[in-house]
Swiss-Prot record:
Annotated S-adenosyl-L-methionine binding sites: 248, 276, 297, 344
Coiled coil: none
Protein family (similarity comment): Belongs to the class I-like SAM-binding methyltransferase superfamily. RNA M5U methyltransferase family.
Name recorded for this polypeptide: Uncharacterized RNA methyltransferase LA_0098
Lineage, opening ranks: Bacteria, Pseudomonadati, Spirochaetota, Spirochaetia, Leptospirales
GO MF terms held by the record: 4 iron, 4 sulfur cluster binding; metal ion binding; rRNA (uridine-C5-)-methyltransferase activity
C-alpha cells in the first residue's frame, strides 16, 4: 500500500461526471477513508478503494479539505466486494463493508504501522512486528445504542448518516454488528410502541446490553459477565458492571485481550499501578503478577464495583480509588512504589498530569491499551527516549467493519 505521503504530485484538476465529482483515490488513510487530491483540494472518501475511479457526493468541507461518499464506481477495484448491509455506505456506523474482513485487517495494520513510523522515526525507535488479534466480525457487540426520532409521524430508529444527525433506519434484518438477541430486542420494542402497549419513548436514544442471551437496559441495570481465560492455566473469572458503566464491547475478544495483557506483563512485580481501571477486570485477570495492586478511576460507582469484583474472584490484596486523572495528581508515594503501570485511557489519551507523572517517575515498564491509535502513538512519542524500548505492538480488532480498533503496546527499560 502507498503511504499518505506518496503520490501528491499525481493530483489533477477536478472533473465533473453526471453532476458529481470524479475522483481517483490513491491511498488508505485513518478513520476508514481513502484519499484523493486535485491541484488545490484534498478529498477523504468513504466507500472508495485506492486505484478506483469514483463519482463522489461531497458531504462536508473545511477550507481545502473535503469529505464525501463514493456513490458510483466507474473503475472497480478487484478488492471490492458487494456490501452485505443494505444501508451501507449511508449509515455512519461501518467503514469497510466494501472490502473483505481480511483486507480490512490488512488496512488497519497498515494505518497503525504508518502512524507509528510518522511519530517515532525521528526518535529512532525500533518498531516491532505488529501482531493482530481478531474474531468473528459479525454479531460481536455486547452493548449498543440506537438513535430515535420522527419524520412527521414516522418513527425513525437506527444510526446517524455519515456527517449528519439524520437517522438511517436499521435494516429489517437488523445490524450485522449486533447479536440477533439485541436486534430482536430493538425490533420488539419498536413493534410494541407501534401497537401502543409501550409508551412512546421521549428519549433520543435506546440502549441495551447483552448478558449471556438476555438483553437488558444499559442505563438502568447492572450486568454480570463471566469468561474462561488462560492465565496461564484455564480459569473462570466473573465480574459485574454497574448500570451505564464502561465495558469492552466485543464479546468474542475479551478473553484473548486479557490473555495478551497477561502474557505481556512481567511476573513478580512489587506493585502494579492501573490507571483508568474501570470495574477492575484487568486486576482480576492479572492479580497473580503482583503482591499489591492499585487502581484509579474517575467513576465512584465503578470503583465500588471493582472492589466487589475482586472479592467475587477471591482476591483481597487489590485497592481501588476514585480520582479524576484529568485534573488531579496521583499520590507520589504510591506511584513510586509501583514497578509496572497499566493504562487504558479514553480516546483522548493520557492527561497531561498522567503523562508528566509517567515521565518523572520512569517505571520499569508499562502497558498501554487504547481504542485510538493516534493519541496512543502521540503519547508514546512524548515519553519514549534512549532509556526505553517499544517491545510489543498488538492490534486488537474490537470493532470489525468500523473505522476503530484497539491497540496494546508494551514499553520497558532497556537492559
Amino acid at each position: 500500500m502507498k503511504s499518505d505521503s506518496e503520490g501528491h504530485k499525481s493530483s489533477s484538476k477536478i472533473q465533473i461526471h453526471k453532476g458529481k465529482i470524479l475522483l481517483k483515490p490513491r491511498s488508505w488513510v485513518n478513520l476508514g477513508y481513502s484519499i484523493a487530491n486535485s491541484e488545490k483540494e484534498t478529498f477523504f472518501l468513504k466507500n472508495a478503494i485506492p486505484g478506483e475511479t469514483v463519482d463522489t457526493v461531497l458531504l462536508k468541507r473545511s477550507g481545502s479539505l473535503f469529505w464525501g461518499v463514493a456513490s458510483e464506481i466507474q473503475e472497480v477495484s478487484s478488492e471490492r466486494i458487494p456490501s452485505d448491509c443494505s444501508i451501507f455506505p449511508r449509515c455512519g456506523g461501518c467503514s469497510y463493508r466494501h472490502v473483505s474482513y481480511q483486507k480490512e485487517l490488512e488496512i488497519k495494520k497498515f494505518l497503525l504501522q504508518e502512524t507509528l513510523e510518522h511519530f517515532l522515526s525521528k526518535k529512532h525507535i525500533q518498531i516491532p512486528e505488529i501482531e493482530i488479534l481478531s474474531g468473528d466480525p459479525n454479531g460481536y457487540r455486547n452493548t449498543a445504542q440506537i438513535q430515535l426520532g420522527f419524520a412527521g409521524n414516522q418513527r425513525l430508529a437506527g444510526f446517524y448518516e455519515e456527517f449528519s444527525h439524520s437517522i438511517v433506519n436499521l435494516p429489517e434484518e437488523g445490524c450485522k454488528n449486533l447479536p440477533q438477541e439485541m436486534n430482536f430486542a430493538f425490533a420488539e420494542f419498536l413493534k410494541q410502541e407501534v401497537k401502543g402497549s409501550k409508551q412512546i419513548l421521549k428519549s433520543k436514544t435506546l440502549s441495551f446490553r447483552l448478558e449471556g442471551t438476555k438483553v437488558i437496559s444499559y442505563k438502568k441495570k447492572s450486568v454480570s459477565f463471566s469468561e474462561n481465560i488462560r492465565i496461564p492455566e484455564l480459569k473462570r473469572i466473573v465480574w459485574e458492571i454497574p448500570a451505564g458503566g464502561f465495558s469492552q464491547v466485543n464479546r468474542y475478544l475479551i478473553a484473548p485481550w486479557l490473555e495478551k495483557i497477561f502474557e505481556l506483563v512481567p511476573n513478580n512485580q512489587n506493585r502494579i499501578l492501573e490507571l483508568y481501571c474501570g470495574s477492575g477486570l484487568i486486576a482480576i485477570a492479572l492479580k497473580s503478577k503482583t503482591t499489591s495492586w492499585l487502581g484509579y478511576e474517575i467513576s465512584s460507582d465503578c470503583v465500588q464495583q471493582a472492589k466487589r469484583n475482586v472479592l467475587l474472584n477471591g482476591i483481597s490484596s487489590c485497592d481501588f480509588k476514585t480520582l479524576n486523572l484529568e485534573t488531579d495528581w496521583i499520590d507520589s508515594e504510591e506511584v513510586l512504589n509501583s514497578s509496572f503501570w497499566i493504562m487504558n485511557p479514553p480516546r483522548a489519551g493520557l492527561s497531561k498530569k498522567v503523562l508528566q507523572t509517567l515521565i518523572k517517575t520512569s517505571p520499569n515498564g508499562f502497558l498501554y491499551s487504547s481504542c485510538n491509535h493516534t493519541t496512543l502513538v502521540r503519547d508514546l512519542s512524548l515519553f519514549l527516549n534512549k532509556d526505553y524500548k517499544l517491545s510489543n505492538v498488538t492490534l486488537v480488532d474490537f470493532f470489525p467493519r468500523t473505522k476503530h480498533f484497539e491497540v496494546i503496546v508494551k514499553v520497558e527499560k532497556k537492559d
